[in-house]
Amino acid sequence: SRGRGDVYKRQAYVIGAPGLLNALYDVGVTMNDVDPDYVIVGETASYNYEVITKAVRLVLNGARLIATNSDLTGPTAFGIAPACRALVAPIEMATGKQAYFCGKPNPLMMRTGLRLLHCHSADAVMVGDRMDTDVISGLESGMSTVLVLSGVSTRETIKTYAYRPSMVLNGVGDIVSLARGEKTED
């Protein structure tokens, strides 16, 4: 049995894109679809009934459930699609176990990112297209925030939140225009 302190020597059953598997492999997590320590759910096009069923069985057998982020939906070239929160929900419902969301808006993720960048939150800006993850994670981490309207949140949905971004832009391209001193179409 692996000791609790061997965080980077853990085994996981991973439902996710190759980038997630590579990142986990890079920190020493090995893949195991028989008796893993964790079931880790990210976003992937290969999500199907078989992998959900396997994940449910593994969680019921003691694996801890982790999800990469709590985004319910996300933008694609074809419109809005289910994101990680929607993909992990059937596993949570079938097992009665709640996933630990390690990505935005998790403060640990934000603090770790700032530390790795050797950056203080007062000198950082969080840019994103979602009020419920991107903007709130920036605000709760002490950063200025920029909401871009090229994704999920709209000017109308901003009004439904008790907090506001520092700035609203039409898209990330407007950041370059602002840096050059050009006027944006805001």
Regions found by a protein language model. Give the residues of each.
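Short, small-residue-biased leader/transition segments that mark boundaries at the very start
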Residues: S1-Y8
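Asp-based, Mg2+/Mn2+-dependent phosphohydrolase catalytic module
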Residues: K9-D186
